[in-house]
């Protein structure tokens, strides 16, 4: 309920800003910027092959027991954090398959808000000219803490593409197949409107702790939708499913 109310509060504040663009003294969104606002329904994401992994990256990947992909295992045998309703983390949240990939973009004067249907979470991509934080998770008292969804800034390129960069995301599964993501990783997202109802998202990853070189993680096409649905992971229900269905089904006969 709290996450749902928070999402409504964010939407309400963003709508207030957008609705008052003509008010005296209120800054307006530059007309040169492509307006990405709207609900976007994603595809059944196909992940691109990752770059060769480092020794540590390969060890983490080998230890992962995913629910999806060529190495998938039964739910009862999986160690995927989402079976416990943990947050998806980043960049996994932008690499989900449909219908989990549905999202809404709300464009304001100083940031782009990205609201996700699954688990009702949101992230802020700041466009006010700030820089990305340095030394996230470092030992200095001034070092910012890692976040599930990292720290993000964005800008518009000359060809109208919205480019977002993210650092400082917690070390989590990078996608549903168990590819690793390190704290020092850097993720670039490129959002391009192909037409009024079609949005392309290209995701590039540079994570030298886990991969030997940068690589293209995915290229997805979203279609415009009307509204998001409520899609929450409930820990008590997830545990009941494991205890009453998944584990008995996996037990030796």
Where are these regions (language model features)?
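PEST-like low-complexity, intrinsically disordered acidic/proline/serine-rich tracts
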Residues: 22-253
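Hydrophobic h-region of N-terminal signal peptides that target proteins for export
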Residues: 12-21
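Generic recognition of cysteine residues
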Residues: 6, 20-23
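Bacterial N-terminal signal peptides that target proteins for export
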Residues: 1-12
